[in-house]
């Protein structure tokens, strides 16, 4: 087995920019930006734009597209288009 080929796996804090929530977890990603966590230790911080805390699928605030109405409007608008002459 080759040594020193795997990335470093360490604790990091993910900061959700949309909701302001922070998660402490382990990852191979690193950052020069750090934060002091609730336990008093300092960890690298990774800013993410969206996470499970702010994504509409997980929060239950998703919008449902009215695709049936759109199809009906399209068919009504182009009903006679492309017919035989």
Swiss-Prot record:
Gene3D superfamilies: Ribosomal protein L31 (4.10.830.30). GO terms for biological process: translation. GO terms for molecular function: structural constituent of ribosome. InterPro entries: Ribosomal_bL28/bL31-like_sf (IPR034704), Ribosomal_bL31 (IPR002150), Ribosomal_bL31_B (IPR027493), Ribosomal_bL31_sf (IPR042105). GO terms for cellular component: ribonucleoprotein complex; ribosome. Keywords: Ribonucleoprotein, Ribosomal protein. PROSITE patterns: RIBOSOMAL_L31 (PS01143). Signal peptide: none annotated. Belongs to the bacterial ribosomal protein bL31 family. Type B subfamily. This is Large ribosomal subunit protein bL31B. It comes from Pseudarthrobacter chlorophenolicus (strain ATCC 700700 / DSM 12829 / CIP 107037 / JCM 12360 / KCTC 9906 / NCIMB 13794 / A6). The lineage of its organism: Bacteria, Bacillati, Actinomycetota, Actinomycetes, Micrococcales.
């Amino acid at each position: 087995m080759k040594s020193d080929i795997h990335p470093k796996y360490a604790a990091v804090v993910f900061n959700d920019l949309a909701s302001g929530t922070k998660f402490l977890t382990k990852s191979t990603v690193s950052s020069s930006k750090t934060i002091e966590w609730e336990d008093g230790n300092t960890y690298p911080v990774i800013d993410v734009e969206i996470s499970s805390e702010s994504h509409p699928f997980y929060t239950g605030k998703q919008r449902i597209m009215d695709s049936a109405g759109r199809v009906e409007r399209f068919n009504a608008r182009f009903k006679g288009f492309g017919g035989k002459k």
